[in-house]
């Protein structure tokens, strides 16, 4: 399936720093960078205020660059509980911002992104930065690391989009076939029930057997 022209917004979620990027798919595996940046919120501010700032900033990006889909890193961390919770709060705000605009969201684990970009699911940040700089033909490495991660997420989705679209198409076809079979089964069951009721009715009242139901149809020449 052709995904040329697909515009993807990649987001590396975080409450203190949230990496944002927008790329556009070209032919084959070609991807063009559109924009990249980082949204920051003050650590000493109230949680609600920080989430509000993040929501507004991300919403402005979505409205300005009009992406077709959002790619977000899945929270997959066993570090500081407070950091993990803050990141989870940020992810919720990001998904809500996308939902308010009717934008689909796809989430990827860090290892999935690393595998897609570098071929190594355990690549370090330096390797990832080198690869994303080369893939997008950037004049210099994107900084900070959150920006590079956001670009990697967006490119990862661009490359996986054709596979996802094929899978979705196959799933839709399978669902349609499944529904068709269910409907046929229901229709067959309804016919069997109706015929059984008619037979029972005729057996209990011979007069009805001599006079077909008004719902029966007779073809005449």
UniProtKB/Swiss-Prot annotation:
Keywords: Cytoplasm, DNA damage, DNA recombination, DNA repair, DNA-binding, Endonuclease, Hydrolase, Magnesium, Metal-binding, Nuclease. Its main location: cytoplasm. Mg(2+) 2 binds at residue 73. The RuvA-RuvB-RuvC complex processes Holliday junction (HJ) DNA during genetic recombination and DNA repair. Endonuclease that resolves HJ intermediates. Cleaves cruciform DNA by making single-stranded nicks across the HJ at symmetrical positions within the homologous arms, yielding a 5'-phosphate and a 3'-hydroxyl group; requires a central core of homology in the junction. The consensus cleavage sequence is 5'-(A/T)TT(C/G)-3'. Cleavage occurs on the 3'-side of the TT dinucleotide at the point of strand exchange. The gene is ruvC. One of its GO terms (molecular function) is DNA binding. It is an enzyme of class 3 (hydrolase). The keyword Magnesium applies. Homodimer which binds Holliday junction (HJ) DNA. The HJ becomes 2-fold symmetrical on binding to RuvC with unstacked arms; it has a different conformation from HJ DNA in complex with RuvA. In the full resolvosome a probable DNA-RuvA(4)-RuvB(12)-RuvC(2) complex forms which resolves the HJ. This is Crossover junction endodeoxyribonuclease RuvC. Binds 2 Mg(2+) ion per subunit. Belongs to the RuvC family. It is found in: Cytoplasm.
């Amino acid at each position: 399936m052709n995904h040329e022209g697909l515009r993807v917004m990649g987001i590396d979620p975080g409450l203190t720093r949230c990496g944002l990027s927008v790329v556009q798919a070209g032919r084959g595996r070609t991807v063009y960078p559109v924009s990249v940046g980082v949204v920051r919120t003050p650590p000493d501010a109230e949680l609600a205020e920080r989430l509000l700032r993040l929501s507004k900033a991300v919403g402005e990006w979505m409205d300005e660059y009009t992406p077709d889909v959002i790619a977000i890193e899945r929270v997959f961390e066993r570090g500081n509980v407070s950091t993990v919770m803050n990141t989870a709060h940020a992810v919720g705000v990001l998904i809500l911002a996308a939902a308010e605009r009717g934008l689909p969201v796809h989430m990827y684990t860090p290892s999935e992104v690393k595998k897609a970009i570098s071929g190594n699911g355990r690549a370090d940040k330096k390797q990832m930065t080198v690869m994303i700089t080369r893939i997008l033909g950037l004049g210099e490495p994107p900084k900070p690391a959150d920006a590079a991660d956001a670009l990697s997420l967006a490119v990862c989705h661009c490359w996986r989009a054709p596979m996802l679209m094929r899978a979705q198409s196959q799933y839709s076809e399978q669902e349609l076939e499944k529904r068709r079979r269910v409907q046929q089964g229901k229709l067959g069951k309804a016919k069997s029930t109706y015929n059984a009721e008619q037979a029972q009715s005729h057996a209990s009242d011979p007069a009805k057997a001599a006079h077909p139901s008004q719902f029966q149809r007779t073809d005449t020449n």
